[in-house]
Amino acid sequence: MYFLLNLVGLIVIMAVVFLCSPQKKKIKWRPIITLIVLELLITWFMLGTKVGSWAIGKIGDFFTWLIACASDGIAFAFPSVMANETVDFFFSALLPIIFIVTFFDILTYFGILPWLIDKIGWVISKASRLPKLESFFSIQMMFLGNTEALAVIRQQLTVLSNNRLLTFGLMSMSSISGSIIGSYLSMVPATYVFTAIPLNCLNALIIANLLNPVHVPEDEDIIYTPPKEEKKDFFSTISNSMLVGMNMVIVILAMVIGYVALTSAVNGILGVFVHGLTIQTIFAYLFSPFAFLLGLPVHDAMYVAQLMGMKLATNEFVAMLDLKNNLKSLPPHTVAVATTFLTSFANFSTVGMIYGTYNSILDGEKSTVIGRNVWKLLVSGIAVSLLSAAIVGLFVW
């Protein structure tokens, strides 16, 4: 029964996004169907085969090694803290970001990461027959994050139509950054994090093409290659990366503290008017129909709906910390669906980040395309997360 409900949920999510599209007649269904089939194959391979499980295990081992290397550096600075059996969130999840950012920048410095993005993007473009730039951007998001991926293609953004600019804004809602993965792994199961990442990239293409279908003539389907800037020396690069990583840690820490405190304050105010009413309860009821359609029993659906609302209103870290404390009491399907949904940057603050990035890259008139379509960005981010969760849910019971 719950499997059929999960399958119906997949169809309902697509149908709701289709109804939200203002240009239904322009939608090209062949690329969308191709990508859905590709996603089902990827999910089956990663979750349903021994080779896929082995591959996820090896990727997980690699990130565990990265975190262990980062922990050595943290232990040098904070030996007494790292000697404890239980280490606080700041030390276990946030400080490793400094080293992981540096590591990914080293891969970029030597051309390894750009090569991977180029090859995978080419495969996606050929398989889906979608524009090259959009296909490459979906892969860039998987490694770099939304603002960084937008910065990489900033020269091309300046000459794109408003319609295509909106497409990149919609896709940016579902990004993730390779440097943050280690933090996720300290809170939720690696298997579902690594499965969610490629699904989010492909679903970002699907949802963007449903909400904002764009026709790109063949002569315009090109990727602008800017002239190579003078390369900084290696040690200047990694030193700058470490500072960038520390800045990310401070920003995330500030947001987590601020949002948790704000949630507590809002709950206190709500409790004055209605005894026991919390923002988590409100979100649980708002998102429960969608959570129920992911094949969850009523009790679990209410809890996952609460996590969905927390992620949208605050960020994925706050929601993952809550999920971490309840993992042992939840069945595998619920854990898989919840983890997959939470693995992305889709929330209100991300809209502000995307708008700010567009403002810094484009002139005032073009950058307003984001401000005029905030609701589409939110629909895109939520729909991509729901779609990824629904697909993973089909394979985990």
UniProtKB/Swiss-Prot annotation:
Family stated for the protein in its record: Belongs to the concentrative nucleoside transporter (CNT) (TC 2.A.41) family.
Lineage: superkingdom: Bacteria
Bilayer topology term: Multi-pass membrane protein
Protein name: Purine nucleoside transport protein NupG
One of the record's GO cellular component terms: plasma membrane
Biological processes annotated in GO: nucleoside transmembrane transport
Keywords in alphabetical order: Cell membrane, Membrane, Transmembrane, Transmembrane helix, Transport
Cell compartments where the protein resides: Cell membrane
UniProt keyword annotation of Transmembrane present: yes
InterPro entries xrefs: C_nuclsd_transpt, C_nuclsd_transpt_met_bac, CNT_C_dom, CNT_N_dom
Main location group: membrane
UniProt induction comment: Expression is regulated by the XptR regulon. Negatively regulated by hypoxanthine and guanine.
Function: Involved in the uptake of the purine ribonucleosides inosine and guanosine.
Species annotation: Bacillus subtilis (strain 168)
Any GO MF annotation of the entry: nucleoside transmembrane transporter activity
Transmembrane stretches, start-end: 1-21, 32-52, 62-82, 97-117, 133-153, 165-185, 187-207, 242-262, 282-302, 335-355, 377-397
This protein's encoding gene: nupG
Pfam short name (any one): Nucleos_tra2_N
